[in-house]
């Protein structure tokens, strides 16, 4: 293992450097002041202790903001064991602060793939035996998958899973469809206060920040291609536009494609006539040869494939703000091209072969090895953005824990294994706390107005079908 374990009475942790704890604690205190919804829930439910008895396995980016989430769960009665969901996303000072507080955490920036899985397993195990966990909080679905594949006995006690991101939700839905999902789950990702804040506004803030920190490039006047125009793509396109880039968008969904056009972006395809037939001849080399920066945002596989990588302009920057590194064909790059590390999470990928020639100018600049760029090359979304996402996680954990799925008779369990979105009333509760944090005042409906539009005075205010 590459990280150092520092026993000091409490040893149920592994972080890079426990001496960073004081720095981490100072940043956590600042983050708390920027997370009004999460801190509001902490105050609102502290006396009630709605998570008393909950034992939560957590696998989500081990950042300063996540530290506030962890300590909120504990303040509401839970015990937790934690790891990061990405090998590059841990902020070592945050992990150290959590460990110093006596909370089991296994995470450090720059884990190997083997260390990453080891860290997840250390949360599942305590003293070498499966911990009696009864809740799961996941981001991307790796923890959920490992539990189903290797520790199905743990799932017998689990009341539910709350999933943070698009990729993890896709995996849950695939498991549900295939009949392999063993416990109910809440899709936190599609809560309005998550998807519109984290996915859209968060990426608007953090994408250009990461690129500038990694490259020191001026982005103005250069051409960018954003692959995907869902909420993450929308925020990413805005992030690059506000830097003065000339932004083009590629999409497969006609509705999202229409939105890109209506938002003033040129809709293009990296393939001639939009058709990828698997040959290099189908790649629009004329288009890609002018692109200075390409970013993938889709949660899909090989959306920046080998043919596209070959056709990109010399010295183009390549990055991903989706969850996994398979959006970009990094496997092809490893097999065929030379990698030269410029600094941590910044590589020159030499397209002239496996040999690295420092004088060669035919290279790409790959950020975070194709993994999540905003956490690999910067510090991710700001606290105020993550406030909404993590408040949703807290309410989702409370909701599933109260349902007590694991205590149901066996005959009733199958029909209760679902993947649901957080109830709208809870989504509105998070939004209201966020508005209060901005100093905003929400106007209340009169009884007559509420009756006229067919809602309760206290909400919910929109049907589930409403698109914000």
UniProtKB/Swiss-Prot annotation:
What is the required cofactor set for this protein? NAD(+)
Q: Which organism is it from?
A: Stutzerimonas stutzeri (strain A1501)
Does the UniProt entry include the keyword Aminoacyl-tRNA synthetase?
no
Q: This chain belongs to which protein, by name?
A: Adenosylhomocysteinase
Q: EC number(s) for this protein? A: 3.13.2.1
Query: Cross-referenced PANTHER family, in alphabetical order?
Result: ADENOSYLHOMOCYSTEINASE (PTHR23420:SF0)
Which Gene Ontology molecular function entries are recorded, alphabetically? adenosylhomocysteinase activity
EC class, as a word, reads: hydrolase
* Cofactor note (record): Binds 1 NAD(+) per subunit.
Family stated for the protein in its record: Belongs to the adenosylhomocysteinase family.
- Location in or out of the cell: Cytoplasm
What is the name of the gene encoding this protein? ahcY
Keyword Cytoplasm in the entry? The reply is yes
Q: Name one GO cellular component term.
A: cytosol
The residues listed in the UniProt record as binding NAD(+), with positions renumbered to this chain, are 165-167, 199, 228-233, 251, 300, 321-323, 374
In what pathway does it function? Amino-acid biosynthesis; L-homocysteine biosynthesis; L-homocysteine from S-adenosyl-L-homocysteine: step 1/1
GO term, biological process aspect, one: one-carbon metabolic process
HAMAP family (alphabetical) = AdoHcyase
Domain of life, per UniProt, equals Bacteria
